[in-house]
Swiss-Prot record:
It is found in: Cytoplasm. It catalyses: 6-carboxyhexanoyl-[ACP] methyl ester + H2O = 6-carboxyhexanoyl-[ACP] + methanol + H(+). Keywords: Biotin biosynthesis, Cytoplasm, Hydrolase, Serine esterase. It comes from Stenotrophomonas maltophilia (strain K279a). The physiological role of BioH is to remove the methyl group introduced by BioC when the pimeloyl moiety is complete. It allows to synthesize pimeloyl-ACP via the fatty acid synthetic pathway through the hydrolysis of the ester bonds of pimeloyl-ACP esters. This is Pimeloyl-[acyl-carrier protein] methyl ester esterase. Pathway: Cofactor biosynthesis; biotin biosynthesis. Belongs to the AB hydrolase superfamily. Carboxylesterase BioH family. GO terms for cellular component: cytoplasm. GO terms for molecular function: pimelyl-[acyl-carrier protein] methyl ester esterase activity.
Amino acid sequence: MHIDVTGRGPDLVLIHGWALQGGVFAPLVQRLADQFTLHLVDLPGHGHSREDTTPLRLPFVVGAIAAATPPAVWCGWSLGGLFALHAAATLPKVRGLAMIAATPRFVRGEDWPHAVEPAVFEQFGRELATDFGGTLERFLALDVMGSAHAREELRTLRQRLVERGAPTERALLEGLRLLESTDLRGALPTLGKPSLWIAGQRDRLVSPVAMQAAAALAPGAQALTIAHGGHAPFLGHADEVAAALQHFVAALSPADGGQ
């Protein structure tokens, strides 16, 4: 699995969302590389890991990332949040958890109302086989919908989607299955790690209400909602997201991974 390493300081692992790659975090790299050693993951089937056939399943991917990185704070965006949360719940070397536009469960249920219908991800899966490019374009449009900087963010996501090669259909389908079926809420009450939950106020995929509900399940969690932010708030509101990550890590005890 390809992992770019840049910067200096405490270690921070960054895991991207569905269909993208580690380069999507460029705005955060620009702001954090002087203070953190950043480990930018390309998930299997994505970016420079396009030929990596590791199954896109939580234990396989988390194990591979953990084997290639030192003790660190793990930060996941969207789908990447599932890997980061699983790591924080199972690995002592994870010193803290940051979730950006990510929750332990992405689909709606009777006891989890503030999420998307399962049919949303099912439809993306069906359409991939008949209209690969159009399906990805529709998903990117959903990523930025509602954001105050939607046009600029959409241009950036389109560029990041193709600059390292398109993701594989296999990896995309496996990612959709994770989004449809994963429920990690049970791990939160006993997480035992500091956590930060960063939501976009206008996110159409992951409701800030759901993120606040998830944070409430984790003892001592911090929750932040970025005003006017969409599903990728680190693009249009990079200063705010970077500052939140800086403050979060700085507040950790040395044992947790603070400076």
